[in-house]
From Swiss-Prot:
Protein name: KICSTOR subunit 2
Role, per record: As part of the KICSTOR complex may function in the amino acid-sensing branch of the TORC1 signaling pathway.
Keywords noted in UniProt: Lysosome, Membrane
Record's subunit section: May be part of the KICSTOR complex.
Subcellular location: Lysosome membrane
GO biological process entries: cellular response to amino acid starvation; cellular response to glucose starvation; negative regulation of TORC1 signaling; protein localization to lysosome
SUPFAM superfamilies: FLJ32549 C-terminal domain-like, FLJ32549 domain-like
This protein's GO CC annotations: KICSTOR complex; lysosomal membrane
Gene name tied to this protein: kics2
Family according to the record: Belongs to the KICS2 family.
């Protein structure tokens, strides 16, 4: 007796389905040019096939080109009208809108197609096209999101929580809207990209609130996903022939978007290592901690230590203003049900990092808090370096604020000029890096950030 299910499994895969699976596999491997050439050749070889098949292949060639432009981020920061009509590159929204319209035509053709010899194909192609319509809409919204992030690079503060909310709403809107097995590589790459970006933005928001464990979990989650994503490029080797014979293989260069996400993760790791240096130091030796922080993209601890040695600073501290923070319990991780009385007085302004000794300079702390209070308006502009000399203790204080809850304090014995260009430049560079908005500027290829 025949088993219908087994017969179905053994039946050869229709050629069209095999072409589609091969195309989306190539797209999932980020072989954009190869995928485009593949469907264009298939279209030329299938001119006698039905109109709906030819139309879908043409749309898929445009999809490969759109995905290449998207992942290389070449659309960011384009000025409309800045180029001549013939040389102006279409915006990413224009490209995906045009693609969306092509796919809608395929859907419409499928609805009006007469019953033919391949009814399954006549059903499959419009169904895939409909799901790809949702995908192109999702891409347009994420591209708009990157445009917004790019413009935020020039601002003093970035509301990461607001960005996470916007990203979450896009994800919920398009969740399971392009779920066909043939599109699984496309769906997977979309999901990983949005997950990584969400976790990194959440991490940025949580570091700014000095929340150790949530920051750590999001940073680790993004790192793990980026590593898995990076394996796709590591496994791809391209052969290069040398001028005088011989050849070598090297990993394929990942697209700009992936490299940018890696850089954002690296800058957040550096900031995390600095803000939570005390908690992390408890897990290893001092020499090992020094080695580990030196490997970060920006070694804040080493940079500040070098500044102290060169300019004979008495102390550099990162002060956390925990007023209004109900969850504040001090360095590291604390059990959710553990109770600790809310800090009062000077304890509302702990030095979460203090160099060179690791302990805040107690005798100077009332002065530090007084300056932070009296000069709060200047500090809240987030680009002002505040100077104060106290004749009684013969000490000079420089203060600057990278973000609302944190203030960098530099203390010198004796008098220092408020016009000391090196000290001011050092602090401005430091708070600019800690603000972590520069990576948003570098979203655009060729930008410094």
């Amino acid at each position: 007796m025949c088993d219908p299910q087994r017969d179905e499994e053994l039946r050869p895969v229709p050629k069209e389905r095999a072409v589609l699976e091969s195309f989306f596999t190539q797209l999932g491997m980020f072989w954009f040019d190869r995928a485009k050439d593949y469907v264009e050749k298939e279209k030329d070889a299938s001119k006698s096939a039905g109109a709906i098949w030819g139309s879908l292949l043409a749309a898929l060639a445009h999809l490969a080109a759109a995905e290449k432009a998207y992942h290389n981020m070449t659309f960011l920061g384009q000025k409309l009208g800045g180029q001549s009509f013939f040389s102006r590159k279409d915006s990413i929204r224009t490209i995906y809108t045009s693609l969306h319209n092509e796919l809608k035509k395929v859907v419409s053709m499928g609805r009006h197609a007469p019953g033919g010899s391949t009814p399954n194909l006549e059903e499959l192609l419009p169904h895939l096209s409909e799901q790809l319509c949702h995908f192109t809409q999702a891409r347009m919204e994420i591209a708009d999101f990157y445009e917004k992030m790019h413009t935020l690079g020039s601002q003093k503060t970035v509301n990461s929580e607001e960005l996470v909310g916007a990203l979450d709403s896009i994800l919920q809107k398009y969740s399971s809207r392009f779920h066909h097995p043939i599109l699984s590589r496309l769906e997977s790459s979309f999901q990983v990209e949005v997950d990584v970006l969400t976790q990194l933005l959440r991490c940025q928001a949580q570091i700014s609130e000095w929340h150790f464990l949530p920051s750590l979990l999001n940073l680790h989650g993004a790192h793990s996903k980026l590593q898995a994503w990076g394996q796709v490029f590591e496994r791809q080797r391209e052969t290069r022939k040398h001028l005088f014979g011989g050849q070598s293989q090297k990993a394929v260069q990942p697209p700009h978007l992936f490299l940018w996400l890696q850089r954002l993760q690296a800058t957040l790791l550096a900031k995390f290592s600095f803000y939570f240096h005390e908690a992390l130091s408890r897990q290893t030796s001092q020499s090992e901690m020094k080695t580990l922080t030196a490997r970060t993209s920006l070694d804040y601890f080493g940079k500040i230590s070098g500044f102290i040695r060169k300019y004979d600073a008495s102390n550099v501290s990162l002060v956390f203003d925990n007023r209004g923070s109900e969850s504040f319990q001090g360095h590291g991780y604390h059990h959710p049900q553990s109770y600790r009385e809310a800090p009062k007085g000077v304890d509302q302004f702990p030095a979460v990092v203090s160099l060179p000794g690791g302990e805040r300079p107690v005798t100077h702390w009332p002065n530090v808090i007084m300056i932070m209070s009296d000069r709060s308006t200047e500090l809240n502009t987030l680009d002002k370096v505040v100077h104060f000399y106290d004749d009684k203790v013969q000490s000079t204080y420089f203060l600057a604020r990278p973000e609302p809850h944190f203030t960098i304090v530099v203390i010198f014995d004796g008098r220092k000029s408020e016009r000391d260009s090196y000290i001011v430049a050092f602090l401005q560079e430091l708070i600019g890096s800690l603000r972590n908005s520069k990576p948003f500027t570098s979203l655009k290829p060729g930008s410094k950030g």
